[in-house]
Regions:
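Basic, Lys/Arg-enriched alpha-helical interface segments
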Residues: 3-56, 60
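Intrinsically disordered, low-complexity segments enriched in polar/charged small residues
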Residues: 8-11, 58, 66, 88-94
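Basic/aromatic recognition patch in beta-strand/loop cores that engages polyanionic ligands
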Residues: 48-78
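Absolute protein N-terminus
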Residues: 1-2, 97
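Short, low-complexity, polar/charged sequence segments that are solvent-exposed and flexible
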Residues: 23-26, 62, 82, 91
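Enriched for short, Lys/Arg-rich terminal
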Residues: 68, 73-97
Length: 97
């Protein structure tokens, strides 16, 4: 099975996303995180299907999941998730503070 690793900031992003959505719908929050986990496994098996995001950093790729975007980099036998952000946010500012 392909590996999916998460940087601490990605873990924090997921907690923030779940907490925000769960205020209105804990079930909806659970479903979104399940979908992110499923897509992460797909990306780990085929890491180059995401869009190259060289403007954010070397080897960074992105993949949309609903209103969110998963940012990751391919690693040996999988991916490492860097961030999970809402698509309406200023992505470049968050990567280059």
């Amino acid at each position: 099975m392909a590996k999916v690793l998460r940087k601490p900031q990605a873990e924090a992003d997921l907690i923030e996303i779940w907490t925000y959505i769960a205020q209105d719908s804990p079930t909806g929050a659970d479903k979104l995180l399940d979908e992110i986990d499923e897509k992460s496994q797909t990306l780990a098996q085929s890491p180059f299907i995401g869009k190259a995001r060289d403007e954010l950093g070397s080897k960074i790729r992105s993949f949309p999941i609903g209103n969110y975007v998963l940012f990751y980099q391919p690693i040996e036998d999988g991916i490492e998730i860097i961030r999970v952000l809402h698509g309406a946010r200023d992505i470049e500012a968050l990567f280059n503070p």
